[in-house]
Design a protein with these regions (language model features):
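N-terminal amphipathic, basic helical "cap/leader" segment at the start of enzyme domains
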Residues: 1-52
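Short coil/turn connectors at secondary-structure junctions
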Residues: 51-54, 109-111
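Solvent-exposed coil/turn segments that connect beta secondary-structure elements
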Residues: 26-28, 35-37, 61-63, 95, ...
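Glycine-rich loops and low-complexity Gly/Arg-rich segments
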Residues: 46-49, 80-82, 114-117
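Secondary-structure transition/capping residues
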Residues: 4-7, 89, 111
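A glycine-rich helix N-cap at a beta->alpha junction
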Residues: 105-122
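Small-aliphatic-rich amphipathic alpha-helix that forms the alpha element of a beta-alpha
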Residues: 21, 56, 60-102
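Generic structural "secondary-structure junction" signal
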Residues: 41-44, 71, 108
């Protein structure tokens, strides 16, 4: 994100900026607040759907017509950043979405769209 302007790095359809990023670690889950550049605690415990040190869960509002496309744009930015900094990641859609939605305290209109396990290259 661009702290100087408050804008996000990834564009979105009609500038909706509806993709929420949750950071899941071994000990807790957080919601990333892009305006404050802060991680807001959501819960304790390990809910990572993969074994990587962290998993980034991209959550979208299913009422937004461009939600899947916006999640794809954010996903590409995550992949490019990780590649450029020597980290390993890959986007995946396979995860227990119902369990994650409950654990992350999502609304009925929000859904986990993509997961990015992030770790070190082997």
């Amino acid at each position: 994100n661009r702290q100087e302007s408050g804008n996000r790095t990834a564009p979105s359809a009609m500038n909706r900026q509806d993709v929420k990023i949750y950071i899941c670690t071994k000990n807790a889950s957080y919601l990333y607040d892009h305006k404050a550049h802060a991680m807001i605690p959501v819960n304790d415990g390990d809910v990572r759907p993969a074994d990587a040190p962290i998993c980034l869960i991209l959550v979208t509002d299913t009422a937004e017509p461009w939600a899947a496309m916006d999640a794809g744009i954010v996903s590409q930015n995550i992949s490019l950043f990780c590649s450029g900094t020597g980290l390993a990641t890959y986007p995946r859609a396979s995860m227990n979405k119902d369990a994650l939605a409950k654990t992350l305290k999502l609304t009925s209109l929000q859904t986990p769209m993509l997961c990015h396990p992030v770790g070190y290259k082997k």
